[in-house]
């Protein structure tokens, strides 16, 4: 299937759609030029390219599944703005914004970057709650995810710079059914975490269970 951002999501659309998506990605109305520059200045190297990739993938998923592309794209460029911070800096932001880390997050503070990024999006960029909520759960997932939550989680997993076993399958599923794609992502993530002997966040288990209860396959 490959990783052409302009064709892996929207079946039957011309590859030139990539240029249109890139044009839209640079003109998200919720995020004016000055704000966009401020956000992107916090991202470096791979994280910069990754966030732009998530923005584009989120816009495409939003257009495919009927969510607001502006909200999806904005969530995409904001989702990792605290990813570069050290574990102690993550915990400091938690203290500042009243975030109470769970036991798993205390052991793996990098998991907090979704919640701390959401806090920054809310406090510094005055983003609406649905965008902040999507950013907050983009790493772990959660029970009863909204469409915007699902789009950001999936866009983060399948964006064009991602290259790991299973990503092409996730991209294929994203063309067919967003819930099936999400369930596949959860399954892959849980399998990897178990294989590596890593802690599993309760929200990830809840997200997986929610899909199963709904009969997603």
Indicate residue ranges for each PLM-predicted region.
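Short, Lys/Arg-enriched N-terminal segments with co-localized hydrophobic residues
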Residues: 8-28
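Divalent metal-dependent catalytic cores for phosphoryl transfer on phosphate-bearing substrates
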Residues: 34-41, 59-184
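N-terminal glycine-rich anion-binding loops that anchor highly charged ligand groups
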Residues: 50
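Charged phosphate-binding loop/patch that engages nucleotide di/tri-phosphates or the phosphate backbone
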Residues: 191-217
């Amino acid at each position: 299937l490959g990783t052409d951002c302009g064709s892996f999501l929207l079946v039957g659309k011309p590859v030139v759609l990539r240029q249109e998506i890139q044009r839209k990605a640079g003109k998200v109305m919720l995020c004016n030029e000055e704000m966009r520059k401020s956000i992107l200045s916090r991202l470096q190297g791979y994280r910069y390219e990754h966030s732009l990739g998530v923005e584009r993938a989120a816009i495409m998923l939003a257009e495919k599944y009927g969510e607001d592309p502006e909200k999806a794209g904005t969530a995409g460029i904001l989702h990792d703005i605290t990813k570069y911070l050290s574990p102690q800096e993550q915990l400091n932001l938690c203290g500042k914004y009243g975030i109470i880390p769970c036991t798993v997050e205390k052991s793996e503070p990098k998991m907090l970057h979704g919640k701390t990024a959401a806090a920054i999006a809310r406090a510094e960029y005055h983003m609406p709650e649905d965008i902040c909520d999507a950013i907050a759960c983009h790493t772990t997932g959660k029970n009863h995810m909204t469409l915007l939550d699902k789009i950001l989680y999936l866009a983060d997993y399948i964006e064009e710079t991602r290259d790991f076993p299973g990503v092409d399958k996730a991209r294929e599923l994203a063309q067919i059914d967003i819930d099936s794609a999400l369930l596949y992502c959860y399954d892959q993530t849980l399998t990897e975490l178990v294989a590596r002997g890593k802690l599993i966040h309760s929200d990830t288990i809840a997200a997986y269970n929610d899909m199963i209860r709904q009969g997603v396959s």
